[in-house]
Amino acid sequence: MSKRTFQPSKLVRKRRHGFRARMATAGGRKVLAARRARGRARLSA
């Protein structure tokens, strides 16, 4: 029996996918720009 792969953690979620994590890299800033251009209500986790 395999374990469930999603083990929720608010801290890890924010650190990996949060706004500041996105802003920290050039690629992450591109992600935010793309989501803004598309008109996303939520830009990041």
From Swiss-Prot:
Domain of life: Bacteria
GO molecular function per UniProt: structural constituent of ribosome
Gene Ontology biological-process annotations: translation
Name the record gives this protein: Large ribosomal subunit protein bL34
This protein's record includes keyword S-adenosyl-L-methionine: no
Classification via PROSITE patterns: RIBOSOMAL_L34
Keywords: Ribonucleoprotein, Ribosomal protein
NCBIfam families noted in UniProt: rpmH_bact
Protein family according to the UniProt entry: Belongs to the bacterial ribosomal protein bL34 family.
GO cellular component, one term: ribosome
